């Protein structure tokens, strides 16, 4: 028998405490469940202020349920790479192409849904940090993703605990693990 549809407002009422930093997500449909056919569906809350960029070998689908978010992306096909911020407003959706470095910035009292396709066997995810001063890659970690919620947290904490990993080899700037208060401006709640 199939499970019932997930009612987002009721789920949030009972489970919003599960959306904890540094990742702030909860897998409502886990890829290990036979019913999901390998798909991952997460409810993600704000605020989060992580500075890492995730690179996934499959597209990612974003739906912004409450409030607005900022999806920071990097076009690595350009030389030099081009940094682009994409606002995703309440009620809007966005499909991020595979292999696009992205940093989802979520603000206070915002909630979104993210869906990821099944990854190929042995596919490698990457968490990467870029230098704010010169744009070079500061550090990255590659891993086979088996549990996004726990693995991302571990890599973020590993980076944060090691100043050598956080120091840009090109210019010496030490990368922050979080954006500073007021550094990023939340887009308007609705698209005007």
Curated annotation (Swiss-Prot):
A divalent metal cation binds at residues 131, 134, 168, 171. O2 binds at residue 50. InterPro entries: 3hydroanth_dOase, RmlC-like_jellyroll, RmlC_Cupin_sf. It is found in: Cytoplasm. Signal peptide: none annotated. Its cofactor is Fe(2+). It comes from the Eukaryota. Substrate binds at residues 60, 106, 116. Its EC number is 1.13.11.6. It catalyses: 3-hydroxyanthranilate + O2 = (2Z,4Z)-2-amino-3-carboxymuconate 6-semialdehyde. NCBIfam families: anthran_nbaC (TIGR03037). This is 3-hydroxyanthranilate 3,4-dioxygenase 1. It comes from Aspergillus oryzae (strain ATCC 42149 / RIB 40) (Yellow koji mold). The gene is bna1-1.
């Amino acid at each position: 028998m199939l499970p019932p549809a997930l009612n987002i407002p009721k789920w949030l009422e009972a489970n919003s405490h599960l959306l904890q930093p540094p990742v702030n997500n909860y897998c409502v449909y886990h890829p290990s469940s036979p019913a999901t056919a390998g798909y991952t569906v997460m409810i993600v809350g704000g605020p989060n202020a992580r500075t890492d960029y995730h690179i996934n070998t499959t597209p990612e689908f974003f739906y912004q349920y409450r409030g607005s978010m900022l999806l920071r992306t990097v076009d690595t096909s350009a030389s030099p790479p081009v940094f682009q911020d994409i606002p995703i407003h309440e009620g809007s959706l966005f499909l991020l192409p595979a292999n696009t470095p992205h940093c989802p910035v979520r603000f206070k009292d915002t909630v979104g849904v993210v869906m990821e396709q099944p990854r190929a066997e042995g596919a490698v995810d990457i968490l990467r940090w870029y230098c704010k001063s010169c744009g070079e890659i500061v550090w990255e970690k590659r891993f086979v993703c088996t549990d996004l919620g726990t693995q991302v947290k571990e890599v973020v904490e590993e980076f944060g605990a090691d100043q050598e990993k956080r120091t840009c080899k090109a210019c010496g700037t030490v990368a922050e693990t979080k954006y500073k208060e007021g550094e990023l401006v939340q887009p308007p709640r609705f698209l005007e």
